């Protein structure tokens, strides 16, 4: 299994979607993550694991913590933690719709899509 995600450092794609998932209480998380791993190529789909998810799996990662919120005069930078973040990257908008549906089906029963942010270049 390749653990690198080259999409993180790649150029900005023409279209993207950021999907933020909430872990469902009492759900079997590990099997859903294994299904997700099979879809993740690190280029078209980049995955980020939140601190709450990592801790619920009993596998803490040194240095991993929730992003703090900041407030400066005229500027708020909120903290928007999620259990799981998926960054979909594509040159076609239609691909993102299909990928989003596939991810929701793959993670069903363990995660719920909480927020989606679409982006374009």
Name each model feature, range by range:
Residues 1-121:
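Long, low-complexity, Ser/Thr/Gly/Pro-rich intrinsically disordered segments that act as flexible linkers
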């Amino acid at each position: 299994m390749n653990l690198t995600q080259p999409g993180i450092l790649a150029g900005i794609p023409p279209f993207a979607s950021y999907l933020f998932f909430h872990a469902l209480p009492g759900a079997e998380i590990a099997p859903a993550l294994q299904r997700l791993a099979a879809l993740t190529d690190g280029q078209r789909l980049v995955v980020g694991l939140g601190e709450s998810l990592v801790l619920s799996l009993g596998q803490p990662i040194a240095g991993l913590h929730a992003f703090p919120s900041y407030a400066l005069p005229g500027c708020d930078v909120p903290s928007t933690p999620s259990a799981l973040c998926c960054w979909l990257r594509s040159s076609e908008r239609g691909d993102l719709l299909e990928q989003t549906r596939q991810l929701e089906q793959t993670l069903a029963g363990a995660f719920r899509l909480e927020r989606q942010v679409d982006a374009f270049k």
